């Protein structure tokens, strides 16, 4: 147990018996009242966001974690089968552990899996940016080049991304896995 004042963003704590990741933590001292820490946390089992006020003197249980590199192999129902890059052991990772970024998991991608001290999976971290191929989009016309609008495009992972008008089928684009937004076209 350590004081909440020694915890920082990204730490994983045990809150009400379940693992939570600290998304943001702000110290507040309102007027002549007692100081507190306003925490926004994400429940790593359910994926729900939780807000909580910790008193400045409160202690929390920080979970000791281990991070390992794994490579995505294939999908088995709602699970993702990953292989340890060092030992070649395979594990099944539930979709909820990856969260909304699961729509950008593609063959061969290397991810970081966060394990707790009891070897259970707390979360999966994808690279911040991934390069995907556009498999389907409406064809570009001369009028499209003059405007700065966007159009929907289907990428190789099966998800839809909003892209600029000049992107064509077969283009490779870089996408932010946190937001799902188009970043840039990749020239190869």
UniProtKB/Swiss-Prot annotation:
Gene3D superfamilies cross-referenced by the UniProt entry: 2.30.30.30, Nucleic acid-binding proteins
Species of provenance: Pelodictyon phaeoclathratiforme (strain DSM 5477 / BU-1)
Entry-linked SMART domains: EFP (SM01185), Elong-fact-P_C (SM00841)
Disulfides per UniProt: none
Protein known as: Elongation factor P
Keywords: Cytoplasm, Elongation factor, Protein biosynthesis
GO MF, any single term: translation elongation factor activity
Pathway: Protein biosynthesis; polypeptide chain elongation
């Amino acid at each position: 147990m350590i004081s909440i004042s020694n915890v920082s963003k990204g730490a994983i704590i045990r809150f009400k018996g379940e693992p939570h990741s600290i998304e943001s933590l702000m110290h507040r001292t309102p007027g002549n009242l007692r100081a507190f820490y306003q925490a926004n946390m994400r429940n790593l089992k359910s994926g729900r966001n939780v807000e909580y006020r910790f008193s400045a003197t409160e202690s929390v249980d920080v979970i000791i974690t281990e991070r390992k590199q794994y490579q995505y192999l294939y999908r088995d129902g709602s699970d993702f089968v990953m292989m340890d890059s060092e030992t070649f052991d395979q594990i099944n990772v539930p979709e909820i552990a990856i969260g909304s970024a699961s729509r950008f998991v593609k063959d061969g991608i290397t991810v970081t899996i966060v394990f707790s001290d009891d070897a259970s999976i707390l979360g999966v971290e994808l690279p911040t940016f991934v390069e995907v191929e556009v498999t389907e989009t409406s064809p570009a016309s001369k009028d499209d080049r003059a405007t700065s609008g966007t159009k929907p495009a289907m990428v190789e992972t099966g998800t839809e991304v909003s892209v600029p008008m000049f992107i064509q089928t077969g283009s490779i684009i870089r996408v932010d896995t946190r937001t799902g937004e188009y970043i840039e076209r990749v020239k190869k």
